Amino acid sequence: MNQIDWTEKIAIVTGGGGGMGQAAAKRFADAGARTFVFGRTLESLRETAALSPNIVPVVCDVADPASVAEAMKVVREAGPPFVLIHTAGVNTPDRFLAHADPSKEASAETWKKVMEINVLGVVHMLQAVSGPMAEAGGGRIVVVSSTAGHGFDSFAGVPYTASKWAVHGLLFTARAQLSAHGIALSEYAPGESNTPIVKMRPVQPTPEHKAAMIQTEDCGEALFFMASQAHSMGVIQMPLYQPFGGMPPQIPSPWLPGLEVRMK
């Protein structure tokens, strides 16, 4: 049962140009929230903005604190944000620490990109919204993590998995600090999800594999549910797995050829 009347509430959704960010933005907008979607390019946000008159596109690179500050000025003109849904995140094809094909090993640039967007992006957004939320009496923040950050699997690659472990620790530490200001901080950790990030995989999943993944609409519903609970019964963490309960044996096999640990 939803505990919050979203009419006239202000929501921010990062990574709003597609995937679960787009699904979440539509869900909050349909509930009546004035929904600001953040994304790196206006082109990527136009499709989302066309879904509802309640959706406002705002160009923002969460890895850049100056860009976040400018985007927040647009939001603050409408009022204080009540909810932040942070879905922005990336992965890359070069994701291994050791591999027979050196081109598949994560470069220094890849490490920097993944950490800046996946980890510092969370930091920048938490810092940007926590002050206005506290001044307004509280709010809701739901950050998308991953089961990769909970020890579920390592097939997402080394940089991505490390970044999600970092996010998990960040949220665990920040939760009590924000709660003291009336801000409920939750972590949504889905397993394999059929989002645009799948395109970064070295081996593309089959249609059957994609159908078995968590779908973006389901992610949008889960994020809305988590943000809609009363502060007294907020959802701290929600790991979400596929119906089959994990990655079946036939799925990891394409990743294994060529994988090796080089000791020299």
Region locations from a protein language model:
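Conserved glycine-rich Rossmann-like NAD(P)H-binding loop of the short-chain dehydrogenase/reductase
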Residues: A33-E47
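The beta1-alpha1 cofactor-binding region of Rossmann-like NAD(H)/NADP(H)-dependent oxidoreductases
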Residues: C60-E70, A108
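Substrate-binding pocket helix/loop in short-chain dehydrogenase/reductase
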Residues: R95-K112
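Catalytic loop of short-chain dehydrogenase/reductase
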Residues: V142-A166, F172, A176-S179
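C-terminal helical subdomain
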Residues: A180, E187-Y188, V203-L259
